Curated annotation (Swiss-Prot):
The lineage of its organism: Bacteria, Pseudomonadati, Pseudomonadota, Betaproteobacteria, Burkholderiales. It comes from Bordetella parapertussis (strain 12822 / ATCC BAA-587 / NCTC 13253). Binds 1 [2Fe-2S] cluster per subunit. This cluster acts as a Lewis acid cofactor. [2Fe-2S] cluster binds at C50, C123, C195. This is Dihydroxy-acid dehydratase 2. NCBIfam families: ilvD, PRK00911.1. Belongs to the IlvD/Edd family. Homodimer. Keywords: 2Fe-2S, Amino-acid biosynthesis, Branched-chain amino acid biosynthesis, Iron, Iron-sulfur, Lyase, Magnesium, Metal-binding. It holds the Pfam family ILVD_EDD_N. Its EC number is 4.2.1.9.
Length: 561
């Protein structure tokens, strides 16, 4: 099979003379048409620090493609900043962006018959959006993560974006003066790169490396370091070789490799968003995978990394301690990874990890051996019960109060809940319910970092529960339960909760329960009426119409299921 197996459809033959004429205008020569066309999906943007450092990575990839005797074809992908849109109407566009990016890359690469694609992304939804596109198309591809941000510093402490969100709660409670508040705001994010803890972007990049779709060590590099540029160039070279070998994403993205990815997510204490996104990636790759698979893996994989938001360290600390290869080697030796999975380099996981030490380096406590794991089981639990028969997601490790039964404080939007929190109307023992924020109801399934961080800042993070049909940021921690499905907008049980109802969150029993009789639940369901959609035009209306339930990834192309 030729290197230009796809692009020859628009570059070969008499009938394609007009097509070639367009390429000549771009500086191509006749000899170039014999070489593969490699797309570079460049997420560079000055909207957010997560993506502001991507251009030099794209430039390195472009040059490496040329040196590898292939033709780079550069196109842009959009982004928004989750950190900037958080707590506002703009956050409704965040999950929408995942689908838009997947559609953009698929449209450009398929429309132009590209032979391979290098995806370069930074902020949270760049990650699954790009991977979904590669999995859908099954065109040789590689993911180049833009890299993590370095931590900020103030008064001897490492800072991340979550430090600022939590400072809001502390400041409003009078626990922090204005000088410290402003200093944290100004020092938390010192440069370019994605948010520094094991939040969503770093979680997904680590998982992509574990799955074999990104190069070893690349997921924990800092954006500003030169090794990140070198890694982008090497990624492009590896991709061109994958095109020549016809090594495709679906050769790599399998049920076994997704199990590897989820095992690493559990071991590193990753984001709840990974559940939603890997349901979507598996759907795109046509890999059988469901929400219960996460619980199956959680029960056998311990947490061996001490990373923010619930731990002490950030991604650059993990990198210095050996990065994802070190985590994977520990899991592989414990029989918790599939060593025979192929990776984008053509090597298996076991071959890739052959020279990685069996034990983490001494003198650090970022990565622990299995026998000294921070928690014996993973942290991302799937809860079920009469409030979420399809399942929901909670971080359950490190909770001082793993069971809470309390009165429901019911809010039909994040904005109403945030107002109540800032007005100090939430008390110890309450269970905050934020509903009509699901994929269809929001629409867009906003992340609830602002209210959860405000609760933490007010000292209520361990004593107040929060459940929502929306999502949580990778920076969220505490007694919080998200992705409740079915969502309120389609008549899910969360829509039937009334102010003051007794609600139980039980991390031990993996239970989310509304403590009323079946008869009362049935009566409320009969009386419930679906509200009108909040949007009837534009991209949010389209997403609300097309998105499926969160328990299946909230994808917009699940028409046949």
């Amino acid at each position: 099979m030729s290197d230009n197996n796809r692009s020859r459809h628009i570059t070969e033959g008499v009938a394609r003379a007009p097509n070639r004429a367009m390429y000549y205008a771009l500086g191509y020569t006749e000899a170039d048409f014999q070489n593969p066309m490699i797309g570079v999906a460049n997420g560079h943007s000055t909207i957010t620090p997560c993506n502001s450092g991507l251009q030099r990575l794209a430039d390195a990839a472009i040059e490496a493609i040329r040196v590898s005797r292939a033709n780079p074809q550069v196109f842009g992908t959009p982004t928004i900043s989750d950190g900037m849109s958080m707590g506002t109407e703009g956050m409704k566009y965040s999950l929408v962006l995942r689908e838009v990016i997947a559609d953009c890359i698929e449209t450009a690469a398929q429309g132009q018959w590209m032979d391979g694609v290098v995806v370069i992304g930074g902020c949270d939804k760049n990650m699954p959006g790009g991977m979904m596109a590669l999995a859908r198309m099954n065109v040789p591809g590689i993911y180049v993560y833009g890299g993590t941000i370095k931590p900020g510093h103030y008064k001897g402490k490492d800072l991340t974006i979550v430090s600022v969100f939590e400072a809001v709660g502390e400041y409003t409670m009078g626990r922090m003066d204005e000088t410290d508040f402003k200093a944290i705001e100004q020092c938390a994010i010192p440069g370019s790169g994605s948010c520094g803890g094991m939040y969503t972007a770093n979680t997904m990049s680590s998982a992509f490396e574990a799955m074999g779709m990104s190069l070893p060590h690349s997921s924990t590099m800092a954006n500003e370091d030169q090794e990140k540029v070198a890694s982008a160039a090497e990624s492009a070279r590896v991709l061109v070789e994958a095109v020549r070998r016809q090594l495709r994403p679906r050769d790599i993205i399998t049920r076994a490799s997704i199990e590897n990815a989820v095992a690493v997510i559990m071991a590193t204490g990753g984001s709840t968003n990974a559940v939603l996104h890997f349901l979507a990636i598996a759907h795109a790759a046509e890999v059988p995978w469901n929400i219960d698979d996460f619980e199956r893996i959680r029960k056998r994989v311990p947490v061996i990394c001490d990373l923010k938001p619930s731990g002490k360290y950030v991604a650059t600390d993990l990198h210095r301690a050996g990065g994802i290869p070190q985590v994977m080697k520990i899991l592989l030796n414990a029989g918790l990874l599939h060593g025979d999975c192929i990776t984008i380099t053509g090597k298996t996981v076991a071959e890739t990890l052959a020279n990685v030490p069996d034990a983490p380096p001494p003198g650090q406590d970022v990565i622990m051996p299995i026998e000294r794991a921070f928690y014996p089981q993973g942290h991302l639990a799937i809860l079920k019960g009469n409030l979420s028969p399809e399942g929901c997601v909670a971080k359950i490790t490190g909770l001082k109060n793993p069971v809470i039964t309390g009165p429901a404080r019911v809010f039909d939007s994040e904005d109403d809940a945030m107002s109540a929190i800032m007005d100090r109307r939430i008390r110890d023992g309450d269970v905050v319910v934020i509903r009509y924020e699901g994929p269809k109801g929001g629409p867009g399934m906003r992340e609830m970092l602002a209210p959860t961080s405000a609760l933490v800042g007010q000292g209520l993070g361990e004593t107040v529960g929060l459940i929502t049909d929306g999502r949580f940021s990778g920076g969220t921690w505490g007694m919080v339960v998200g992705h409740v499905a079915p969502e309120a907008f389609v008549g899910g049980p969360i829509a039937l909760i009334r102010e003051g109802d007794s609600v139980t969150i039980d991390a031990h029993q993996l239970l989310l329960q509304l403590n009323i009789s079946d008869e009362e639940m049935a009566a409320r369901r009969k009386a419930w009426a679906q509200p009108k959609p909040r949007y009837v035009r534009g991209v949010l209306a389209k997403f609300g119409k097309l998105a499926c339930t969160a328990s299946r990834g909230a994808v917009t192309d699940a028409f046949e299921e």
